[in-house]
Amino acid sequence: MKMAMRRSIFTTQGSSTFRVMRGMRSVVLARHQPRPPLGKDLDQGHISRRTISSSSPRRVQHIDLKELERLVKEAQERLKKLEDEAGEPLKRTTPLHMSIAECLRWKPESEEDNVVVQGYVRSVRGMKTHRFVSLGDGSSLAPLQAVVPVDTNQAEGLAIGAAVRLTGKWVASPGASQSHEMQVTQVDILGPSDAKTFPIQKKYQTPEYLRTIPHLRPRTPINAALLKMRSEAVAALTRFFADHDFTQTHPPILTSSDCEGAGEVFTVAPASNIAELTDEDSKSKMFFRNKKYLTVSTQLHLEALAQSVGNVWTLSPVFRAEKSDTARHLSEFYMLEAEMSFVNDLDEVMDLAEDMIRNMCITMYESHTVHEFLNREGRVGSDLVPPEEVNARWEGMMAEEWPRLTYTDAIEFLQEHADEFEHKPVWTEGLHSEHEKFIAEHVGGGKPVFVTDYPRDIKAFYMREGQSIPDDTCPGPTVECFDLLVPDLCEIAGGSMREHRLEPLLEAMKRHNIVAGEFTSSMDGNAPTGAKAGPLDWYVDLRRWGCAPHGGFGIGFDRLLCYLTGVQTIRDMVSFPRWVGRCDC
């Protein structure tokens, strides 16, 4: 197979041999990639690579290796015939363009000519007759080592940060850092760089410094890997929802209301008319006739879309005008939200969230990018969790049957250990961060934990009421909702059954001071009389005409990726982070 790969473009591109062998290069490279370790053998343990869950219709597709071997053998025979006719081995006459990740995984038995790689110079070490260049292109954490004779054309332009194309031989390396290296015969400087002023040097640079140059930060190996892992996560989620017959949607970014009712919104106005933000008498002059905001959640609009096509989802930016200057908060971040129609049980919503995250992790865990990131070597600063701890997180996320307990049971459990907390657990006051960490650590055993059925008065108005009459086991009314807690990071997701009945919804909105005016229980036009929900009138309308039971959830996408990568500050997970006082680039 190695011989076949080396000769992948010897014949004409129109031939079937070329088509077979061109596709073989990526297959061979993938098959030589080592499988990442995971404490337990996924094929033998409690995690199955073939079946995501008992309720999931998706099955991982496998290549028919016998058919693949037949095609390879056929191609090799045709190549041998061509060589016999020519009387000598065929040589490649066209360049072989490869990514650096492909090169580093490629270990041919003999040297390969006319290999081309492109990327950015990470470092240059000058010797008397040669320059040793480290090249990166974002496809791999590890750089490619290239040996460049000093008399090579344009070799003097090889400086840190330069964009270059190198052509040469791929040969076995006498050094220990990598099995092969490139002996360069041609250098093309595509984008010059001044090494003295380039802000990113080979030495370790702190996350705090890199945040001051967000436009250049992605060029560092770790940040490039984070970008690729983010892309792979989006691809895995998209496949999961497509396989489960969810419709991807694009809800609006501009909205007329604050979904959470917390008032933490950004108001939007044209730059030419900033005065309209404060002038209450200028309603007629406003661009949208009244104040509009950047969305804090797409949930309400997703509920409307779900009543059309059933199950829907989105991955959209949301905005919070919070002045929280912490490692967990941003003013702009991405939220994955999903809504399910015709469901009447919170367990169904939790099942979807659990299956989705587990599926995403299992899919990503097979990738070269994740394998390399979790098994990287070198300096581990305080900005990254050690790889062995991050591996344990992945194992927990890919495990089956995440624990579930009610909020009331959680409070009772915490009260048994009350002396360990700064804030004593009280049923009416919610869970503090220290409580969530304790639950995730001691109840989950490394797995995520669902906490359900929170007190009604500390949750949002749109959540369906559950137990409304207090008894010996439950001090007050609750709502059918959940928070998903993970060790170390705490909450990464929240969801609920939505209140689909008109009168209970209006009652809840009244308790939250959203409905203006009184209303009676008599129905007029399928709506209680006198009820005015203001900017949320349209949301109330959804309950007036054929609103089925439904539920959904939201996941802080950036926070989830922080957990899976070991990045300890969400500002380092987002390419261009915005938080209070900072909105660079």
Short names for language-model regions:
Residues 2-585:
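Class II aminoacyl-tRNA synthetase catalytic cores and aaRS-like
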